[in-house]
A protein has these predicted regions:
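C-terminal domain-boundary segment and adjacent tail
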Residues: 176-182, 250-298
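Loop/turn elements at helix/coil->beta-strand transitions in domains of secreted/extracellular proteins
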Residues: 34-37, 75-81, 105-109, 146-152, ...
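Metal-dependent polysaccharide deacetylase catalytic core of the NodB/CE4 family, i.e.
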Residues: 79-164, 185-186, 248-252, 256-259
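Active-site-adjacent pocket scaffolds in enzyme catalytic domains
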Residues: 7-10, 15, 25-26, 92, ...
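Well-ordered, non-membrane alpha-helical segments in soluble/globular domains
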Residues: 55-70, 91-99, 127-140, 227-239, ...
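Active-site beta->alpha N-cap acidic-glycine motif
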Residues: 2-103, 252
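Conserved aromatic-histidine-acidic binding/catalytic patches
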Residues: 30, 53-57, 121-128, 153-158, ...
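Alpha-helical structural signal in soluble globular domains
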Residues: 71-75, 100, 139-143, 168-175, ...
Length: 298
């Protein structure tokens, strides 16, 4: 067996299932990630989805978190990934906002973080992980009307997944192309210590044997001691030679509860996200999704 034909649209692989079988030709299919770009994502995403379930809005963007994201998109061209922390919450979201989600598909995508709070995939089976990804994908398509709203290189809880879980998610319809790894020295997902060392040094590891690309997370918003200074921090990375591989793309994230709660709205920490967006805009660094930066060869 080999690969199904790859059809691309807006940088997204649109086949129902990309890999029929992973073989030694993987290196001919993928090259490296490209020029400078930035990816912004939110782990533990649940509050904004809960609001869509519990409240009725005239527009999707009347929900405060989604409205804030749209404001950043409109002002800076920012794009975001929301990594879902509870599949039950996702399945409860109504289809009321499908047309707006569909229109936002090029700048707002969803991926899996965990099927429920506190759960990681370090010991999960192939079948169960594949089932969870199926639930994630079908839930996203239900509320957005398109598979183009799926982020296929997500960040799983604790940066953890057994090889069985990783390949189960890979083999699901609209399955993963890879994962976003840890922002520290811990070993991520199914990698060995040696593979993780390559990842840390190069900010990416191409797992040819299993058909997965692993990208290092470069910064988390919570590292900053205050809400001020994120812009200057990002500027410093441009002149730091140790970050030479890190803008291909620069993988920046925070957690939804750090910047937003369903009951209290946006926190003062939302400024760190706003500063990253302004920095990228000012320095002409495009916003992207890692899946769109893969150089997929014909």
């Amino acid at each position: 067996m080999g690969y199904t034909k790859l059809n691309l649209k807006d940088g997204n692989i649109v086949d129902e299932k990309v890999f029929q079988h992973i073989d030694n030709n993987f290196s001919q299919l993928y090259d490296t990630v490209g020029d400078y770009s930035i990816h912004i994502s939110f782990d533990d995403t649940v509050a904004c989805l809960t609001n869509l379930t519990k409240n009725t809005y005239t527009s999707l963007f009347d929900e405060p978190f989604f409205g804030w994201l749209k404001g950043l998109h409109d002002m800076y061209g920012a794009k975001f990934s929301l990594y879902v922390y509870n599949l039950t919450t996702l399945s409860s979201v109504p289809t009321t906002y499908k047309s707006e989600f569909f229109e936002a598909r090029h700048w707002l995508k969803f991926g899996l973080h965990s099927k429920q709070s506190g759960f990681n995939y370090s010991s999960e089976t192939y079948a169960n992980a594949k089932k969870d990804w199926n639930s994630l994908a079908s839930g996203i398509i239900k509320i957005t009307g398109t598979h183009q709203s799926i982020d296929r290189i997500p960040r799983l809880h604790n940066f953890s997944a057994s090889l069985e879980a990783a390949t189960g998610m890979r083999d699901a319809p609209c399955g993963v192309l890879g994962f976003l790894a840890a922002d520290d020295s811990r070993v991520s997902y199914h990698l060995t210590e040696a593979q993780n060392a390559i990842l840390k040094a190069q900010s990416q590891y191409l797992d040819k044997e299993n058909g997965l690309i692993i990208l290092r997370t470069n910064y988390r918003g919570e590292w900053l001691n205050s809400a001020d200074g994120m812009y200057e921090m990002m500027e410093s990375f441009l002149s730091d030679s140790s970050y030479v591989n890190c803008f291909k793309p620069f993988v920046w994230f925070t957690h939804e509860p750090y910047v937003y709660s369903a009951s209290n709205g946006l926190t003062d920490k939302a400024k760190v996200v706003e500063d990253v967006c302004k920095f990228a805009y000012d320095y002409h660094i495009p916003f992207t999704y890692p899946q769109n930066e893969l150089n997929i060869k014909p």
